[in-house]
């Protein structure tokens, strides 16, 4: 039986998820009000249908897939739409937000008497013919969205309340993106001090797995750095203000903010990171 699923918004992940759902028989709606021509084309290419707010609110399931800094505002917008509907959609927050934030979002959606699921996406946007990222779901209604498996998504239920899936996402991202933060900061510092080749050679000898990861992670992170700023602050909040390590992630937020601005400007540090990554590949050949 087909389902109508609304995805807000049609970014890189949202549109790729929409394509996967559409390929497996779901009807996928999105909001295109005020969106750029490029975004509208991306949505159309993914088989998404532009819809008014009323139609969005009538979907069976709504997936919120936006930058973490926009998650609460979107929840408030959705609650204002849903509260007027007799039939309530299941709202799933799939964003990289901490436990406190997702519990706040649960309260907002709950004020509209709609069922809410805490979600966390781990993995890359699905490519045609490729595997789905993992969609971890928790909360009372998590089992109700397991139906998304029938439409091509890898849904994994976390036995726990709202907050459990987000805690998993925060912990995983804190490790994986934290390594990207540490690696990129040290590579730039080493390069500016004339030690790039020596660092690369030593990592190849003693830490080959880390070097292999940096080869991919350094160039891959640059176009995403702006999105990671708010995520690092969410991770800092997940640890808590009194946790000694929380300032590490606040520092990563500032570092990724710098890299995002650098990549858009003179790209000094961005080019150093790309050069280091290219050097890894050249050493292997």
Regions found by a protein language model. Give the residues of each.
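Rossmann-fold dinucleotide-binding core
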Residues: 5, 97-177
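Helical "substrate-binding/catalytic lid" subdomain
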Residues: 168-269
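Short, basic/aromatic-enriched C-terminal tail that caps enzymatic domains
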Residues: 267-285
């Amino acid at each position: 039986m087909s389902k109508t699923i609304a995805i807000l918004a049609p970014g890189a992940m949202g549109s790729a998820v929409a394509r996967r759902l559409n390929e497996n028989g779901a009807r996928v709606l999105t909001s295109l009000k005020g969106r750029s021509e490029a975004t509208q084309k991306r949505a159309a290419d993914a088989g998404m249908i532009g819809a008014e707010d009323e139609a969005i609110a009538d979907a069976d399931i709504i997936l919120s897939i936006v930058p973490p800094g926009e998650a609460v505002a979107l929840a408030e917008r959705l609650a204002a739409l849903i509260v007027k509907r007799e039939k309530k959609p299941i709202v799933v927050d799939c964003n990289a937000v901490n436990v406190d934030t997702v519990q706040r979002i649960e309260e907002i959606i709950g004020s509209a008497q709609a069922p809410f699921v805490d979600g966390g996406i781990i993995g890359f946007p699905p490519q045609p013919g490729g595997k789905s990222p993992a969609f971890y779901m928790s909360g009372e209604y998590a089992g109700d969205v397991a139906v998304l498996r029938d439409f091509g998504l890898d849904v994994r239920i976390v036995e726990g309340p709202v907050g459990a899936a987000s805690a998993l996402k925060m912990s995983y991202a804190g490790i994986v993106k934290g390594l990207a933060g540490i690696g990129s900061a040290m590579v730039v510092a080493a390069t500016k001090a004339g030690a790039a080749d020596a660092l690369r050679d030593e990592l190849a000898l003693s830490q080959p797995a880390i070097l292999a990861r940096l080869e991919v992670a350094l160039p891959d992170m640059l176009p995403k750095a702006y999105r990671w700023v708010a995520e690092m602050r969410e991770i800092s909040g997940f640890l808590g203000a009194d946790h000694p390590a929380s300032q590490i992630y606040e520092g990563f937020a500032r570092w990724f903010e710098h890299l995002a601005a650098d990549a858009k400007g003179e790209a000094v540090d961005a080019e150093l990171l790309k050069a280091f990554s290219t050097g890894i590949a050249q050493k292997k050949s």
